[in-house]
Amino acid sequence: EQVERRCKAYTADAHRTHLVQPGMVYISQTTEVGTLYTKAEVKALHDVCKKYGLLLFLDGARLGYAVESPGNDLKLEDLPHLCDVFTIGGTKQGALFGEAAVIVDEELKREFPYHIKQRGALLAKGWLLGIQYETLFTDNLYFRLARHAADLAVKMHKGFKEAGFYFLHNHETNQQLPIFTQTQFDKLKEKGFYFDHFADMKDGRIVTRFCTSWATDPANVDRLLEAIKDL
């Protein structure tokens, strides 16, 4: 609805030639606050984009974590039917570096190699990207690593709720955003835990961020959940 309102406002503006011409809608899965787009929501965005001649780009830096999260209904195999371009994250999901760009739109496919070259993104040893993904997609490793993070996120979410904490968003993806008082925040820092001061609330409380990943040690999650019990 937001995208359609923007598009309608743009096309109705008699002075639109003085504005930036819209060309693409960008979303990420998961989002920067750990929320998920549903399949129906992405389908709705796709339909609006087609209606107004826009491309739909999905940033999948955390795509594996999204796919393996409880309640997610947007699968990897759905994306070529709903997006013009999407990425399959590597850097945040076990690869040494790099992202895999999946281009569905045929016109973009023809132009993309030239954009890579012109913007300094062409690696002399590009096979180093390919071999990482070949390994990650062997024996379902990519999704097994993501499932590890998802399982620990569920455990963390449950532990925070049982300790009486509220969340900025109530979800179970690998980014958890529990809300702390300043005193709770300071006490947990003193216990030696590192976590993000994500945002400040109007009432003085602090939104924090804890992330799980393919490399998270379950023992560290246990230590954290034990530590928050007496905050």
Language model: regions and residue ranges:
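Active-site-proximal loop/turn and secondary-structure-junction residues that shape catalytic pockets
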Residues: 31, 62-64, 92, 216
